[in-house]
Structure formats: structure tokens, C-alpha cells
């Protein structure tokens, strides 16, 4: 059984202290990739110098290419376009892989042509360590139904390996989205292929001070937009999935409205909560949030009158 070749795409931006460890974890794979493509998306510093000691001992080509400077999604697209492998694996510059990761995932792709994307479980930690794994991959993958992908993004991007064909047919990451580009991509892939997860912590998601905190309001807005695009593009199809997506959009508006309310942005909060109720009326949290908006406005008006 011929194993498919793997190209690794690693976007990076000004994390020269963390990048060498990520590259080293790729080089330590028991099944080495065909190539590693590092997309420098505007680092303040010399990427080549930071990883030179690792490159000198690698047994496969490591290439640094310039990125467009517009975030990880566009940078990943540069890597996908340049990749030569049958499979494309993604890893972020602040995450790590266990040595068995690519070997286990690649063996599943070779055995099952219906698979388009295979992720792994991820260990979230501030202190990376090498997990004690059995010598053989699990006997079964955990399939990810499309309904689970509509509810939320269950995949850490650094855990994902996908067939090259997925991008040839579905296109690349949607660069017009500010956030959640990966989730929108997985939804498109899941329309045509099976999605699964190796039930073992083969990816290490590092928690560290440099991680950029996201505005919760912006995150909720992007969640709703991803699902809207899925409905419009047909990546979310069928009556049950479409109904589920509409409920999830309503729930995203509800959470966004409540986050705005906590931030004191009452007018915007009321707009979001009304939108949530218009999409799905049976949302007690949206109704109670709307009542709080009105009470807040009433209290402010009474205070102004006094």
C-alpha cells in the first residue's frame, strides 16, 4: 500500500522564539513529510536565521516563502498553492506535533478513499510534553458528522491533514472572513468527503502570553457569518442541517447581544437580540436579555429626567 505524500504548511508572523520548536516537531515525525512550506506573513526578524539550526539537520526540503501580510488564512492559501504533496497538513507557529502524528493520519488516508480531512485530539497546555502513546494507531477513527460541524468547529487547525483534491475542488480559505476561516473551509470539505478525528492527543495547542485575545462580539459575528455563507453556498444542505444552522445563527446573535449588553452597548445589544428572536423565537436568554435592555434604557431615561 503506497502512502500518500504530505506537504506541511506553516504560517508565521513574528514568533521567532516559538517557531523553531514547531519546525523541530515537524522534523521529528516518524514518517517525514515531503516538504515543509513556511509562509512568513511579515515577521519582525529573520526567519531563516531563527530556524537555520533545524534546517541543517532536516531530511526533507524546508522552504520559506513570503506571505501577503493579511493573516493566517491568506498565508495558508499561499502554502496550499505551492504544495506538491497528495495531502496537506497545517501547523501554526506556536503549536507542536507528537512524533507519530503524520504516520497515523497518513495510514488512514491510504486505507479509506472517502476521507477528505482527518484531525486529531489536541492537548491544550502551557508546558508541552511528549505524550506516552501506544505503538499502533487506534483501530477506529471518530467520525465527525456534518451536524457536529454546523454546531461548532471541533477541529484545531494544527491537527488537520486534508487531501490536496479538497482544495482543488472546494477552493482555498475564504480571505474575506476576518476570523473562523478554518471552520468555513471544513464545512465546504465536509460536503464532499468524510471528516474524522484520530482519538489520540497528537497535537499540542500551546497556551502562552503572546496569544492574541479575540473580541467576543467579533467572534460571535463571525460564527453567524460562517453559517450564513454555508447556507448560501450549499456547503450546509438538507432540511435538517439548514434548520440547525438557522438555530445556531440565532444563538450566535443571542450570545453576541448578551456580550454587547455586558459591555454597556445597549442599542447594539437590543438589535442583535431582536435578530436572534426573529430567527428562532424559543430563546429564553434572548428574551431576558431584551428585557434587560429595556430596563436599562428606562433607568437611563429616568436618570436623565431627574
Model-flagged regions — what are they?
Residues 1-221:
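Nucleotide-sugar donor-binding/catalytic module of glycosyltransferases
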Residues 3, 207-306:
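C-terminal subregions of glycosyltransferases and related glycan-biosynthesis enzymes
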Amino acid at each position: 500500500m503506497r502512502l500518500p505524500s504530505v506537504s506541511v504548511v506553516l504560517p508565521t508572523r513574528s514568533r521567532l522564539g516559538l517557531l523553531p520548536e514547531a519546525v523541530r516537531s515537524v522534523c521529528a515525525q516518524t514518517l517525514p513529510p515531503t516538504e515543509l512550506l513556511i509562509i512568513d506573513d511579515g515577521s519582525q526578524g529573520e526567519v531563516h536565521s531563527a530556524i537555520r539550526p533545524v534546517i541543517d539537520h532536516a531530511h526533507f526540503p524546508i522552504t520559506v516563502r513570503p506571505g501577503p501580510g493579511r493573516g493566517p488564512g491568506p498565508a495558508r492559501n499561499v502554502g496550499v498553492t505551492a504544495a506538491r504533496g497528495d495531502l496537506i497538513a497545517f501547523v501554526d507557529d506556536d503549536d507542536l506535533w507528537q512524533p507519530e502524528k503524520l504516520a497515523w493520519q497518513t495510514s488512514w488516508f491510504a486505507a479509506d478513499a472517502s476521507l477528505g480531512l482527518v484531525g486529531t485530539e489536541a492537548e491544550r497546555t502551557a508546558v508541552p510534553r511528549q505524550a506516552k502513546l501506544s505503538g499502533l494507531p487506534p483501530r477506529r477513527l471518530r467520525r465527525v458528522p456534518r451536524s457536529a460541524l454546523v454546531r461548532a468547529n471541533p477541529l484545531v487547525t494544527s491537527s488537520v491533514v486534508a487531501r490536496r483534491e479538497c482544495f482543488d475542488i472546494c477552493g482555498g480559505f475564504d480571505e474575506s472572513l476576518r476570523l473562523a476561516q478554518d471552520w468555513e473551509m471544513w464545512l465546504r470539505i465536509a460536503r464532499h468527503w468524510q471528516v474524522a478525528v484520530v482519538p489520540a492527543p497528537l497535537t499540542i495547542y500551546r497556551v502562552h502570553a503572546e496569544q492574541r485575545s479575540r473580541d467576543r462580539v467579533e467572534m460571535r459575528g463571525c460564527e453567524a457569518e460562517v453559517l450564513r455563507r454555508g447556507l448560501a453556498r450549499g456547503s450546509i444542505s438538507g432540511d435538517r442541517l439548514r434548520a440547525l444552522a438557522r438555530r445556531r445563527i440565532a444563538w450566535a446573535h443571542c450570545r453576541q447581544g448578551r456580550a454587547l449588553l455586558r459591555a454597556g452597548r445597549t442599542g447594539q445589544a437590543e438589535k442583535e437580540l431582536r435578530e436572534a428572536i426573529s430567527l428562532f423565537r424559543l430563546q429564553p436568554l434572548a428574551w431576558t436579555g431584551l428585557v434587560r435592555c429595556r430596563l436599562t434604557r428606562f433607568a437611563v431615561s429616568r436618570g436623565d429626567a431627574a
